[in-house]
Amino acid sequence: MKKNDIRLYNVLFPIWFLFLFPQLWLIMLPANFVIDSLVVSLSALRQKLEHPFTLWRKSILPIWIIGFASDLIGAGLTVLLFYGFGILGRLGIEIPNLILFPGTPLISIPGLILAGFLIYFLNRTFSFRSSALDAQQIHKLCLHLALWTAPYTMLIPLYG
C-alpha cells in the first residue's frame, strides 16, 4: 500500500449493538450512507472518472441498500456459526474454547468475508448498470466498496 492511500472502514456496523439499542438504526442508516458516498466519490476521483457526481447520484441508493443488506447477511452467517458450534458442543463434539468464546473474531471471519463478497458481486451486478463505465472501472469501484465498507466491527468481541 502506498503511503498516501486512504482507507475508510465501515466501522458503524456492530450488529449486536443495534439489537441492544434499536434507536441507533436512525443513526446507522445515514452514517452508512455517508461512508458509502465517501468511498464511491473518492474512488471515482482517484480513477479520474468523468462526471463523478452523476455517477454518485445514479448509483448511491443501490450501493447503500446492497451494503446494508450484505452486512446483515454476513452478521446472520456469524450468528448461525456461533449457534451451530454451540449445538455441536452440546452433542459431545469437542470444539476448542477459543472458537466458542462469544463474539470471537474467529467465528466472525466467514461473515466478514461473505459480506465483502456480496458487496462486491451485487454492486458489480446492479449498482452501475446505468453508468457508461467499462468493466475495469466498475471492477475497481466495486473492489473499493467491498474492501473499505466491509463490516470490520464484526471482529470486535462482545465482551471479554
Predicted feature locations:
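Juxtamembrane/disordered regions of integral membrane proteins
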Residues: 1-160
